[in-house]
C-alpha cells in the first residue's frame, strides 16, 4: 500500500532484481608483484584485496553494464522495452560524449527509457538509487534500471603501487520499482558532498582545466591520484555519521540492522566504520578480496551476491553506505 503524506500519495520503492558482471581475467597480488615493488602480504595487510578483475581488450564499460543489467532484468521479470528510466553511475564511460547510459539504452533495446549518467565516483550507485527512489515514490516511473559500471584498469598508473593494487573492473545493476507491500522497500536515503576535499582523490587531466595533450599524458594527469591517508580519515569520520543519520530518521537503532552492504574500497575502512558503530563483521557482505575496489559497481555487486546467496530475507533491515571522490558519500535503509 502507498504511504500517505498529507494529501499526497507516496509509493514505497523496492529493489526488484539485481545483477552483476566481472570480466574473466583475474589479476592476483602475485601478478602485481611482477609489475611494481609490492607483495601479496603488503597488499593484503593494507587493503584486504587478494585479486581483481581486468576487462578484456576491446571490452568497454557499456558491455559490462549490459550483462549486469540483463541479469537484473531477468530476476525482476522485466523486459528492457518496459523500462521507464536508466541511470548509470560511472566515472569511466566509453567516451566523454554521449553518456554511457544512452549507449546502454541502445544495446538493451530500451527504447521507452530516458537515460543519463551520474558522476559521484564510488558513491554513484547510491546516488542513482536515491534519484530512482524519488521517481518511483512520486509515481513518475515504475521500472528504473540503476547501474554502477567501471573500467578502472584503464585509468590507473600501472607503475604506481599505491593505486594500481586497489582497483578492478566490474558492473552491478538493480531494477527498481514499486514495493510489493507497504512494509517493504526503501525507508530513506541520505546524500552528502564536500568539494573542499576534491583534491584527495582525482583525475586532473582530460577536462577543461587540463585538456588532453602531450604534457597531460607525459605527466600521467589522465590517471587516478589519491591521498590514501586522508581518504581513510575522511571515510571513518563521515560514514558512521551517515548510518546513524539514516537510523535516526526512521526511529531505529544500530542493533536493528540485519545486514550492512558497504562500498568496499579498503577492508580497513569497512572494519573501522563497523567497529565505531558496534556492528559485527558477520552482518557485512564482503567481496573486496575477490574484486578489489570497483567504485560505483561495488555496492550493487555486493547486494546481488548477498541476494543470490539467499542471505536477504523478506523484512530484513539492510543498511547501505558508500563514499567516493568529491568527496561524495551517503547512506540508505531498506526493508527487504
Where are each of the predicted segments found?
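Acidic, glycine-rich active-site loops and adjacent beta-strand->loop/helix elements
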Residues: 20-21, 89-95, 120-125, 148-153, ...
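Buried hydrophobic positions in well-ordered alpha/beta secondary-structure cores of metabolic enzymes
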Residues: 15-17, 43, 72, 86, ...
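Catalytic phosphate/nucleotide-handling subdomain of diverse soluble enzymes
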Residues: 301-321, 327-336
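Phosphate/pyrophosphate-binding loops at sites that engage ATP/ADP/AMP, CoA/4′-phosphopantetheine
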Residues: 68-84, 241-258, 306-311
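Conserved catalytic cysteine-centered active-site region
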Residues: 42-63, 90-144, 275-303
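Condensing-enzyme catalytic core mediating Claisen C-C bond formation in acyl metabolism
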Residues: 2-57, 160-233, 237, 241, ...
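Active-site pocket-lining segment
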Residues: 222, 235-240, 254-277
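Flexible, glycine-rich active-site loops centered on histidine and acidic residues
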Residues: 137-171
Amino acid at each position: 500500500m502507498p504511504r500517505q503524506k498529507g494529501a499526497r500519495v507516496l509509493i514505497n520503492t523496492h529493489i526488484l532484481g539485481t545483477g552483476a558482471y566481472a570480466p574473466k581475467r583475474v589479476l592476483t597480488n602475485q601478478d602485481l608483484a611482477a609489475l611494481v615493488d609490492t607483495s601479496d602480504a603488503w597488499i593484503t595487510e593494507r587493503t584486504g584485496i587478494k585479486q581483481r578483475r581486468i576487462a578484456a581488450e576491446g571490452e568497454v564499460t557499456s558491455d559490462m553494464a549490459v550483462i549486469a543489467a540483463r541479469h537484473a532484468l531477468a530476476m525482476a521479470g522485466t523486459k528492457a522495452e518496459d523500462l521507464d528510466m536508466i541511470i548509470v553511475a560511472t566515472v569511466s564511460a566509453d567516451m566523454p560524449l554521449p553518456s554511457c547510459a544512452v549507449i546502454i539504452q541502445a544495446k538493451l533495446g530500451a527504447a521507452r527509457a530516458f537515460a543519463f549518467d551520474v558522476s559521484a565516483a564510488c558513491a554513484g550507485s547510491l546516488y542513482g538509487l536515491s534519484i530512482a527512489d524519488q521517481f518511483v515514490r512520486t509515481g513518475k516511473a515504475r521500472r528504473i534500471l540503476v547501474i554502477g559500471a567501471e573500467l578502472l584498469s584503464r585509468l590507473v598508473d600501472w607503475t604506481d603501487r599505491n593505486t594500481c593494487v586497489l582497483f578492478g573492473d566490474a558492473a552491478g545493476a538493480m531494477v527498481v520499482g514499486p514495493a510489493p507491500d507497504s512494509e517493504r522497500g526503501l525507508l530513506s536515503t541520505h546524500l552528502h558532498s564536500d568539494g573542499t576535499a576534491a583534491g584527495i582523490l582525482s583525475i586532473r587531466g582530460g577536462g577543461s582545466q587540463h585538456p588532453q595533450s602531450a604534457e597531460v599524458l607525459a605527466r600521467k594527469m589522465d590517471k587516478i591520484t589519491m591521498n590514501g591517508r586522508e581518504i581513510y580519515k575522511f571515510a571513518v569520520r563521515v560514514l558512521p555519521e551517515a548510518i546513524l543519520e539514516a537510523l535516526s530518521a526512521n526511529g531505529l537503532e544500530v542493533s536493528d540492522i540485519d545486514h550492512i552492504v558497504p562500498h568496499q574500497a579498503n577492508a580497513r575502512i569497512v572494519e573501522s566504520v563497523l567497529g565505531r558503530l558496534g556492528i559485527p563483521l558477520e552482518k557485512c557482505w564482503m567481496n573486496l578480496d575477490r574484486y578489489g575496489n570497483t567504485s560505483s559497481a561495488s555496492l550493487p555487486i555486493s547486494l546481488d551476491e548477498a541476494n543470490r546467496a539467499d542471505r536477504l530475507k523478506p523484512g530484513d533491515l539492510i543498511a547501505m553506505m558508500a563514499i567516493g571522490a568529491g568527496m561524495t558519500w551517503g547512506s540508505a535503509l531498506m526493508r527487504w
